[in-house]
Amino acid sequence: MWRVPRRLCVQSVKTSKLSGPWSRPAAHMSTLLIHHPQYAWLQDLGLREDNEGVYNGSWGGRGEVITTYCPANNEPIARVRQASLKDYEETIGKAKKAWNIWADIPAPKRGEIVRKIGDAFREKIQLLGRLVSLEMGKILVEGIGEVQEYVDVCDYAAGLSRMIGGPTLPSERPGHALIEMWNPLGLVGIITAFNFPVAVFGWNNAIALITGNVCLWKGAPTTSLVSVAVTKIIAQVLEDNLLPGAICSLVCGGADIGTTMARDERVNLLSFTGSTQVGKEVALMVQERFGKSLLELGGNNAIIAFEDADLSLVVPSVLFAAVGTAGQRCTTVRRLFLHESIHNEVVDRLRSAYSQIRVGNPWDPNILYGPLHTKQAVSMFVRAVEEAKKQGGTVVYGGKVMDHPGNYVEPTIVTGLAHDAPIVHQETFAPILYVFKFQDEEEVFEWNNEVKQGLSSSIFTKDLGRIFRWLGPKGSDCGIVNVNIPTSGAEIGGAFGGEKHTGGGRESGSDAWKQYMRRSTCTINYSTSLPLAQGIKFQ
């Protein structure tokens, strides 16, 4: 994702002009963007003015009607009817029935279906990427790259479907076998956030399906059109293969639906992606019923650059990790620790790089930086910048709301704060980078670990010993621990997730498939004798 030639970064943030329909005054716009000829392609994704937000083999919805908006100009796109609690109950029932069919299909055959789902997304990658850009606000190359992640994880899951399983273990008893069996949990509930409305669902959905589960998805209300379009693509694949649509169900909705999922004992695993505050509430509700949860929550990620760091790697890495998706990734770098000997030079280089970021219409292939997702996010940005100033910080770049239609703010660099300032320890989902000086390895490793979250981290150094100390027990306490690359851009082949208040869950690659299955330890006696534990003998 975000592979854009450096030559395109030529227009200043502060002098950029937004052009095209994204920046037209409201007087020039009709009621809904979907009515405009330039958005006719939305119909190729099965979208229309009014969309049903419930799918369980058929489309419906009896809940509230909401309108989704384009963050680049805050114009309405289309409407979606959400799920009612009655819709939810019906969908759960149909999903449970669909599981009886899906679980009986051999894992490699399930993998073939998932591969076909990936192929279907590959065919729609440009259209769906444009929709992600339109409704979420990220630049087009990121929107397309996000859909590519779904394609990639489907390819990965298809191969994995032929490899999942447990070991055969040596038994202490003659004539006995000791094996591990892995079976599906049943119904996996998936609640995703606005910032990756396709990819995070894909990480969960593809792996959950090949492990024999059915899925119930609630996406973010503000990206409901993406949820509907994604589900339509999957539903067509299931229909073409004569399978129940309720294998992959959708219930668009708000907190009432999310709370119901968290409390529902029929939801065998609930995967939740969102804020730490809401995630804690979800975890408590699931734990209260002794259920399983998979949490991907906040991140207060750091990059550390030592005196021997290659600055030609550091500067673009920080730029990518700090302003990509306008600072709205869970892996966005929010803290930058620079050795005192290189601090001033790196800050100067970053200010120069920031001044060349091209801002504007997210569909323009030259653009590298789009809007925040909502007006509320803009307000949080403003409050965070003001609070940073009050706590002793100096804004050396940006810090203001941009005078353009839409939710645009300047990418911002703040220096001069204490490493443990309250605002630094608070995750603000916006492009604000706090920069600090450090003197030695021990103190900066401690600073990296002192925040409550533990998602992603990276150091830049050529010192081999330092690298392995960073990876070791006294190094980073994060789930993602990088060297000489950004905090963002995780590959699907590795397990994605973090520690501490990030939630502890793991998704996507490696052995994350185990999260979606239950393990049974099985002892099989194939002899004619019965050796009992502790040598007990019944006469």
UniProtKB/Swiss-Prot annotation:
Active site per the UniProt annotation: E296 (proton acceptor), C330 (nucleophile)
CDD domains xref list: ALDH_F7_AASADH (cd07130)
UniProt site (Transition state stabilizer): N195
Residue range of the transit peptide in the UniProt record, numbered on this chain: 1-26
EC number(s) on file: 1.2.1.31, 1.2.1.3, 1.2.1.8
PROSITE patterns xrefs: ALDEHYDE_DEHYDR_GLU
Binding site for (S)-2-amino-6-oxohexanoate: T331, G489, A490
Residues annotated with N6-succinyllysine modification: K86, K94, K97, K537
Reaction catalysis annotation: nonanal + NAD(+) + H2O = nonanoate + NADH + 2 H(+); (S)-2-amino-6-oxohexanoate + NAD(+) + H2O = L-2-aminoadipate + NADH + 2 H(+); betaine aldehyde + NAD(+) + H2O = glycine betaine + NADH + 2 H(+); an aldehyde + NAD(+) + H2O = a carboxylate + NADH + 2 H(+)
Sites where the protein binds NAD(+): 192-194, 218, 258-259, 274-279, 296-297, 427
Record key words, sorted: Acetylation, Cytoplasm, Mitochondrion, NAD, Nucleus, Oxidoreductase, Transit peptide
GO molecular function: aldehyde dehydrogenase (NAD+) activity; betaine-aldehyde dehydrogenase (NAD+) activity; identical protein binding; L-aminoadipate-semialdehyde dehydrogenase activity
Top-level lineage group: Eukaryota
Leader sequence segment: none
GO cellular component, one term: nucleus
Function: Multifunctional enzyme mediating important protective effects. Metabolizes betaine aldehyde to betaine, an important cellular osmolyte and methyl donor. Protects cells from oxidative stress by metabolizing a number of lipid peroxidation-derived aldehydes. Involved in lysine catabolism.
Descriptive protein name: Alpha-aminoadipic semialdehyde dehydrogenase
Species the sequence originates in: Mus musculus
Gene it is expressed from: Aldh7a1
